[in-house]
C-alpha cells in the first residue's frame, strides 16, 4: 500500500499545486529550493522530493518563451522613452524612472560569477544559477529583454544617506548607466542597505521601489536632484544559515553616471549625450545621442555668446547687392582709431564689397575721384601726389591726409575732377564754384574773376542773353513750368476771397473790345519777337513766324474762352451761390495788365502764354504772364423779389375763378366713396357667416329633395 500511496501522492501532487500562474510569476518551489540555492548538506543530497518539485515549473516554460517573444520589442521602445525622459525631465512622472536599465541588470549579475577570492561562500560567485534547469533560465532570459514589474516594498529596509567618498572601481556591477536613478537586482537571500553619513545633513532622495519576481528583488531608487553632489553607497550582505550577515561588496554612484557638474547650483542646458557603460559585459550605449538637438543647442550657445560679446549679428542684405556711392565711400573710409597707427589703407577687393556684380578697377577709381572733397585744393596740387595714390578726405583733428594705395595697378592713372556742365546755371546748381582749378583755365583767355561774380542770373531776376542763346530749349521748358494757372503752387494768383467787379453794361461791346485787343496784342507780339542768328533751323523759323504764332494763340484762346462753364480748361461754374456786390476798378491805359472779370460770384479766366520782347526793357527776352478776361457773354442775376412795370391782376370774387381741375377731382373722389358705401350697405350682409350658413343649408335641402324624387320615380 505504501508504494501505491506513494504513487497516488505523485499523481495528486500536480493537482494540489495546479494553479494558473502568469509566466512572469513562476510557481514558487518548496522550501529549500531557490534559483540561488544555498549549499546543500549531505543530508539533503538524496531526497527525491526535491527533484520532483521542479516538474510543475517546467510545464509553464513554453508560456514564458511565448510571452518573451511577444514582448521582445518593448525594451527598445522603453529605452527610447527613457532617453527622451532625460531631455524632458519634468514631463514624465518619477515612477517611470524605475523601469530604467533593467535590460542590463542580469548581465551585471553574470559578470560577478567569476570568482574573485578563494572564499567562494562569502562572494557572489557561490550564488551561480543552474543553467541546466529550464524553469530557472527561462525567467532570467525573459528578464534580459528588459521587462520589469512594479510592486510595493514589503520586506527590505532601505535607508538613504549621502556620502561624498572616492570612487570604488571594484564595485560597479549593479550600477546602471543612468543619470538620476539606480536599479539593483538582488536575490531574495541577500539584504541590501543604503548607508550615508547623517552628519552631512542630507535628506532622503526620491521615491523608493522594491519589486519581487519569484526569488529576486529589484530595488530601484531615485536620487534627489538637490543632492546630486552626494554619492549613495550601497552595501550588499549575505545572510548565512547561522543568521549572521557578512558583507559581500559595495556599490557607489560615480560622477560619470550622475553627470555632476561643479556649478550644479546653476541651471545647465540639456544634454543629449549618453555616457558609455561602466561595467564589463554590457554593450555601451550610443555616444552620438541626438545630433539634431545637440546641433541646435550649440547654435543657440554661439548666438548667445555673440550677443554677449556685443558683436554684430549677421543680417541679410536688404538691398540685394545694390549700394550707393556714400555706402561704398564709407566702406573705403578708414576708422579713426586705425588711422593713428596706419595712415594708409588698401582698397578692398571687388568681392568684399557687397554686390551682385564686381565692378572694374577703372569704375572704382572714377567713383573715388568723384568723392574727393574740395578741401584738398588748399593743399599741394595733384602733381604733388604719386600716381599710385588718390587723395581722400582729410581726417578731423589730424594733420595728415588718408590716401588709398593703388600700387598694384599698372601705369599712371589720370586724376579726373568733378564733371562740369556746359550750362553755367546747371553747373552752379550742381555745386560748381568760381575757385575750380580745372574750369578756371579758359582757352579764349577770358577773365574768370569777372565772370565769377555772375551767379547765372541777371540783376533783374531774368535769364541772361548768353544762357538764352546757348539753351533755347531750356527757356521753353522753363516757360512751361511757369504756367499762368492761378492755382499753380509755383505761381499762385487766384484770389483768396472772391469780390465782384463792375461788369460792362453791353457785353457785346466788351467782346468786341477784348477781341480787338487780343488781335492787337497778337500782331504786336508777332512783330516784337527777337530775331537771333541762332534761330536758323526750320523748326525755329516756324516758331518765329507770326502767322503760326497767331494761329496757336487763337487756338489756345478758343479752348480757354469756351462758353461751357464746366470746361476743365476754363471752369466757371459757381460752387456756392451768393449775392452780387458790384465793385471793381478798370484801367484802360494799361491793356497789357492783368484784368480779372468776376461775374455771378465766380471768376472768368482766360490764359494766354505770350513771349513779349520789347526794345525798351532791359531784358529783351522775358516771360510775362497775363491773365486776360475773355470775351464772355455775361448777364446780371435778378433778385428773388422784382418789380415789373406790367402787373397781372387776379380777382377772386367770382365763383368761376374758384372752380378748377382740383375741385373736379375732389368732387369725383367724394362721389366714388359714396357709391362704395351704398354698395356695401346693399350687399354687405351676404358676406356674413349666418347668411352663408343659411344659404348652404337651403342648397343642401334642395339637393336631398331632388334625390328623393329620383328614388320615387
Curated annotation (Swiss-Prot):
Query: What is the disease in the record?
Result: Microcephaly, short stature, and impaired glucose metabolism 2: An autosomal recessive disease characterized by microcephaly, intellectual disability, short stature, and disturbed glucose metabolism.
Q: What is this protein called?
A: Protein phosphatase 1 regulatory subunit 15B
Cellular component terms (Gene Ontology) = endoplasmic reticulum; protein phosphatase type 1 complex
Bias class Low complexity marks the residues at 123-134
Binding partners and assembly: Part of a complex containing PPP1R15B, PP1 and NCK1/2. Interacts with PP1.
The record's listing under Pfam families reads:
CReP_N, PP1c_bdg
Question: Which organism does this sequence originate in?
Answer: Homo sapiens (Human)
Which Gene Ontology MF annotations are present? protein phosphatase regulator activity
Q: Does the keyword Kinase apply?
A: no
Q: Which residues carry this modification: Phosphoserine?
A: 203, 205, 508
Q: Where is this region: Disordered?
A: 22-53, 115-134, 376-398, 434-472, 502-548
* GO biological process terms held by the UniProt record: ER overload response; negative regulation of PERK-mediated unfolded protein response; negative regulation of protein phosphorylation; regulation of translation; response to endoplasmic reticulum stress; response to hydrogen peroxide
Q: Which UniProt keywords apply?
A: Diabetes mellitus, Disease variant, Dwarfism, Intellectual disability, Phosphoprotein, Translation regulation
Amino acid at each position: 500500500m505504501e508504494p501505491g500511496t506513494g504513487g497516488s501522492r505523485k499523481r495528486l501532487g500536480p493537482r494540489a499545486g495546479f494553479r494558473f500562474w502568469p509566466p512572469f510569476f513562476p510557481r514558487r518551489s518548496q522550501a529549500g529550493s531557490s534559483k540561488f540555492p544555498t549549499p546543500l548538506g549531505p543530508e539533503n543530497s538524496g531526497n527525491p522530493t526535491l527533484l520532483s518539485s521542479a516538474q510543475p515549473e517546467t510545464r509553464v516554460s513554453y508560456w514564458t518563451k511565448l510571452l518573451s517573444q511577444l514582448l521582445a520589442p518593448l525594451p527598445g521602445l522603453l529605452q527610447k522613452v527613457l532617453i527622451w525622459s532625460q531631455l524632458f525631465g519634468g514631463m514624465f512622472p518619477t515612477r517611470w524612472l524605475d523601469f530604467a536599465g533593467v535590460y542590463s541588470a542580469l548581465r551585471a549579475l553574470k559578470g560577478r560569477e567569476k570568482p574573485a577570492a578563494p572564499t567562494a561562500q562569502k562572494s557572489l560567485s557561490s550564488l551561480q544559477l543552474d543553467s541546466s534547469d529550464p524553469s530557472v533560465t527561462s525567467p532570467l532570459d525573459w528578464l534580459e529583454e528588459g521587462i520589469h514589474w512594479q510592486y510595493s516594498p514589503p520586506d527590505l529596509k532601505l535607508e538613504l544617506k549621502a556620502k561624498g567618498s572616492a570612487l570604488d572601481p571594484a564595485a560597479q556591477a549593479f550600477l546602471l548607466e543612468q543619470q538620476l536613478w539606480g536599479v539593483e537586482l538582488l536575490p531574495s537571500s541577500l539584504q541590501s542597505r543604503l548607508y550615508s553619513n547623517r552628519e552631512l545633513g542630507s535628506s532622503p532622495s526620491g521615491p523608493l521601489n522594491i519589486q519581487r519576481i519569484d526569488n529576486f528583488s529589484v530595488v530601484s531608487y531615485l536620487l534627489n536632484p538637490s543632492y546630486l553632489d552626494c554619492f549613495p553607497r550601497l552595501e550588499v550582505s549575505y545572510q548565512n544559515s547561522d543568521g549572521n550577515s557578512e558583507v559581500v561588496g559595495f556599490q557607489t554612484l560615480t560622477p560619470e553616471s550622475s553627470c555632476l557638474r561643479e556649478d550644479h547650483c546653476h541651471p545647465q542646458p540639456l544634454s543629449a549625450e549618453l555616457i558609455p557603460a561602466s561595467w564589463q559585459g554590457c554593450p555601451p550605449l550610443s555616444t552620438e545621442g541626438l545630433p539634431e538637438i545637440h546641433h541646435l543647442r550649440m547654435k543657440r550657445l554661439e548666438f548667445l555668446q555673440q550677443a554677449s560679446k556685443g558683436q554684430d549679428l549677421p543680417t541679410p542684405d536688404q538691398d540685394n547687392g545694390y549700394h550707393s556711392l556714400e555706402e561704398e565711400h564709407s566702406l573705403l573710409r578708414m576708422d579713426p582709431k586705425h588711422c593713428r597707427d596706419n595712415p594708409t589703407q588698401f582698397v578692398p577687393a571687388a568681392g568684399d564689397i557687397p554686390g551682385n556684380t564686381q565692378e572694374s578697377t577703372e569704375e572704382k577709381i572714377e567713383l573715388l575721384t568723384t568723392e574727393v572733397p574740395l578741401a584738398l585744393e588748399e593743399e599741394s596740387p595733384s602733381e604733388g601726389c604719386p600716381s599710385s595714390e588718390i587723395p581722400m578726405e582729410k581726417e578731423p583733428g589730424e594733420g595728415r591726409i588718408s590716401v588709398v594705395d593703388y600700387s598694384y595697378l599698372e601705369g599712371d592713372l589720370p586724376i579726373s575732377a568733378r564733371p562740369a556742365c556746359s550750362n553755367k546755371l546747371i553747373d552752379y546748381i550742381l555745386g560748381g564754384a568760381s575757385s575750380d582749378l580745372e574750369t578756371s583755365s579758359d582757352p579764349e583767355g577770358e577773365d574768370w574773376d569777372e565772370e565769377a561774380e555772375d551767379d547765372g542770373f541777371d540783376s533783374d531776376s531774368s535769364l541772361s542773353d548768353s544762357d538764352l542763346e546757348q539753351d533755347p530749349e531750356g527757356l521753353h521748358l522753363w516757360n512751361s513750368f511757369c504756367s499762368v494757372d492761378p492755382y499753380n503752387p509755383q505761381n499762385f494768383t487766384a484770389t483768396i476771397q472772391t469780390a465782384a467787379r463792375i461788369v460792362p453794361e453791353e457785353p457785346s461791346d466788351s467782346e468786341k473790345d477784348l477781341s480787338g485787343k487780343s488781335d492787337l496784342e497778337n500782331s504786336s507780339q508777332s512783330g516784337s519777337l527777337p530775331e537771333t542768328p541762332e534761330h536758323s533751323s526750320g523748326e525755329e523759323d516756324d516758331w518765329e513766324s507770326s502767322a503760326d504764332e497767331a494761329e496757336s494763340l487763337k487756338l489756345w484762346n478758343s479752348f480757354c474762352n469756351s462758353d461751357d462753364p464746366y470746361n476743365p480748361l476754363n471752369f466757371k461754374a459757381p460752387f456756392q451761390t451768393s449775392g452780387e456786390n458790384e465793385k471793381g476798378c478798370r484801367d484802360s491805359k494799361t491793356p497789357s495788365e492783368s484784368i480779372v472779370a468776376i461775374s455771378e460770384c465766380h471768376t472768368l479766366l482766360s490764359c494766354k502764354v505770350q513771349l513779349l520782347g520789347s526794345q525798351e526793357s532791359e531784358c529783351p527776352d522775358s516771360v510775362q504772364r497775363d491773365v486776360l478776361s475773355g470775351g464772355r457773354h455775361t448777364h446780371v442775376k435778378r433778385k428773388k423779389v422784382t418789380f415789373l412795370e406790367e402787373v397781372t391782376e387776379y380777382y377772386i370774387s367770382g365763383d368761376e375763378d374758384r372752380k378748377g381741375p382740383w375741385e373736379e377731382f375732389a368732387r369725383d373722389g367724394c362721389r366714388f366713396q359714396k357709391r362704395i358705401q351704398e354698395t356695401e350697405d346693399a350687399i354687405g350682409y351676404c358676406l356674413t357667416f349666418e347668411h352663408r350658413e343659411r344659404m348652404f343649408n337651403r342648397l343642401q335641402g334642395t339637393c336631398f329633395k331632388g334625390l328623393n324624387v329620383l328614388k320615387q320615380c
